[in-house]
């Protein structure tokens, strides 16, 4: 067997390759750090109060807006306080997005991809009321109507996007105690999530119906300020992200074709590690495919779910590959048969499969339902919030356990390699130099794998926490920087690109020599290599199994000769 390119590539060429890949890695970090804005931005909108006619309350096509021709006449807080019924069942809280700036109307761009809304509620009781601390988990019923219009539409050309009557549960604390009323401020609650930001303007109407027979919203005194936080992906970050995907996609496809072609030129079936590399490259190619360009033309509310599925497939394949990659370099073959996933790694991978399926089910339960009802959220009920939080915590703990187990496997690889180095002094000088060079290369590659795994786990945990921070606590501020995101994404591509090159079969043909001539020829190679500026780690003739991908994995079966 000719071995892999990692074994046969000269020191100078390998150094040039590694330096080039490290330079690309630095450029990926700089691309996000210098040119991309923060991944997400948000705007805070204070609700406007409008009063509607009783006859239009059940008309879902009737929408009130606060800016433009035909806007509603705003109701002041003083007018509400002076009304004997506090305008019950007549008030509509209006939120029009985005807000104008410098007397100029702004609009959303399709580059911003998605929109998430969370609401902070403030309500009050008369100070004469005996209630001083509201009970926890107050159930609030909200009639929500979300509408949109585009550039060129008239000011009153709002079209209904979604309508629903939803329940939210509030945890509140006392914020102000006055002579006439006591105010309570509540934690943020998830309101809606749009997987596609296809239209220019959005309008949200909120009603809080009161009904005595069904005890609907009677535990609240009267609503005060409502604050909507609208979170969107920054368009500048999306452009940098798609630029990175567009540049990386053809390189990965090209190197996969090159790798698989070299494998099929061999007179053997592909090894397990070669299959795993091509599967990993396919998962990365699916992730790199810049499908987001389609959302600039078509409305694709399922893009968030599709992105989660693509990233989940890549994570599953990457985690699987690392376990197999470390296992194949253990240098311990329990059986002479060819390694398969089912025979050697099913115990290791069962946890990965269960974890990925659990996260997929969790994602489908939320974002799958949101395709039909953007107001749905698993965080809206106390039980759902606990289940969601449990999933996130378990995902983080599982990621940490996986990383520790991978560290243990790589440590075993290092220990096994160290144990086998004790046989090097009994070998000929040529073979000893050959294997010492291979050992250094494989150790460096294993350390690079460990760094890649650590950054991947850190990025996964930060992503889960950043996604849920608006749902569990408004005081948490976790947002991965653009440099970190583009750097980690580039690292995945560079790492897999390097593996496909280094583990491709080498087609160098070395002349066959008799055993009696090998020592003389090896010594001549050593002298020539020492005098050369470029040292070649030549593959020495051996009786290695042709099904093995690397000569290092057959190290234990090599017989030293002089």
Curated annotation (Swiss-Prot):
Topology: which residues are Cytoplasmic? Answer: 1-13, 261-270, 333-344, 412-441, 504-562
* GO biological process assignments: imaginal disc-derived wing margin morphogenesis; intracellular protein transport; positive regulation of protein secretion; positive regulation of Wnt signaling pathway; regulation of intracellular protein transport; segment polarity determination; Wnt protein secretion; Wnt signaling pathway
Pfam families membership: WLS-like_TM, WLS_GOLD
Going by the UniProt annotation, this protein carries glycans at: 58
Topology: which residues are Lumenal?
35-239, 292-311, 366-390, 463-482
Parts of the chain that traverse the membrane: 14-34, 240-260, 271-291, 312-332, 345-365, 391-411, 442-462, 483-503
Which GO-annotated molecular functions does the record name? Wnt-protein binding
Recorded GO cellular component terms are:
cell projection; endoplasmic reticulum membrane; endosome membrane; Golgi membrane; neuromuscular junction; plasma membrane; postsynaptic membrane; presynaptic membrane
Checking InterPro entries in the record gives: WLS-like_TM (IPR047843), WLS_GOLD (IPR053936), Wntless (IPR009551)
The answer on whether this UniProt entry bears the keyword Nucleotide-binding reads no
Keyword Ribosomal protein found:
no
> What is this entry's stated membrane topology?
Multi-pass membrane protein
Q: Which UniProt keywords apply?
A: Cell membrane, Cell projection, Developmental protein, Endoplasmic reticulum, Endosome, Glycoprotein, Golgi apparatus, Membrane, Postsynaptic cell membrane, Segmentation polarity protein, Synapse, Transmembrane, Transmembrane helix, Wnt signaling pathway
Cell location = Presynaptic cell membrane; Postsynaptic cell membrane; Cell membrane; Endoplasmic reticulum membrane
Question: So what family is this one in?
Answer: Belongs to the wntless family.
Its biological purpose? A segment polarity gene required for wingless (wg)-dependent patterning processes, acting in both wg-sending cells and wg-target cells. In non-neuronal cells wls directs wg secretion. The wls traffic loop encompasses the Golgi, the cell surface, an endocytic compartment and a retrograde route leading back to the Golgi, and involves clathrin-mediated endocytosis and the retromer complex (a conserved protein complex consisting of Vps35 and Vps26). In neuronal cells (the larval motorneuron NMJ), the wg signal moves across the synapse via the release of wls-containing exosome-like vesicles.
Q: How does it assemble?
A: Interacts with wg; in the Golgi. Interacts with Vps35, a component of the retromer complex; wls stability is regulated by Vps35.
Stated name of the protein: Protein wntless
- Origin organism is Drosophila yakuba (Fruit fly)
The record lists the lineage as: Eukaryota, Metazoa, Ecdysozoa, Arthropoda, Hexapoda
